[in-house]
């Protein structure tokens, strides 16, 4: 007779119990995002990833083929969610009101980032290294950049926004997100864990960009 203890030994390391509920794809990708954010791409092993996902030790190899392919799937999913939310905000406002569209998109971007601090941590980590992974991230960001850039250009041309380069606008909008991705430091400065301050942050950023 096979005992429960024997069955547990035979499952092997990293393999979930046979009757354990499997996470859905969104949960798998979210757990992967958290693992890459907390441990770093180079430091985390495939075995650690599978354990963090709650899957068997061959899951990533069987489903994605490699750690790199899994990382790409994780980042594609996370950035797509942000892109969809910000693009929807852009499209909600009247096409002729560029200022309202830009304001709505910045607010939506900060709100989306506040809910996804692990995404910002991964991007910050990769942004300091000239690598194929950074090039891949930039490609994923391109649809949102392509949608927002014409609005930015028109507002600069008409004098509503300060006459600044596009790259400066990008960093002015994105770098304050450290408040969400660096939660332990923000906590030391007195930011409550349940703070709902993304709207205030957006207002401060926009006020600094408007003429």
Language-model region placement:
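Helix-turn-helix
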Residues: 23, 27, 31, 35-69, ...
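Short alpha-helical scaffolding segments that buttress acidic/His motifs in well-ordered protein cores
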Residues: 106-109, 123-126, 173, 177, ...
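Short amphipathic alpha-helical elements of helix-turn-helix/winged-helix folds
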Residues: 31-35, 112, 176
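Hydrophobic/aromatic-rich alpha-helical bundle segments in the mid-to-C-terminal region
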Residues: 134-135, 142, 156-202
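Hydrophobic alpha-helical connector segments
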Residues: 73, 87-118, 169-173
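N-terminal intrinsically disordered/low-complexity leader segments
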Residues: 1-23, 34
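Short, basic, alpha-helical segments at the C-terminal edge of helix-turn-helix-like DNA-binding modules
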Residues: 76-82
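Short secondary-structure transition hinges
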Residues: 111-149, 153, 167
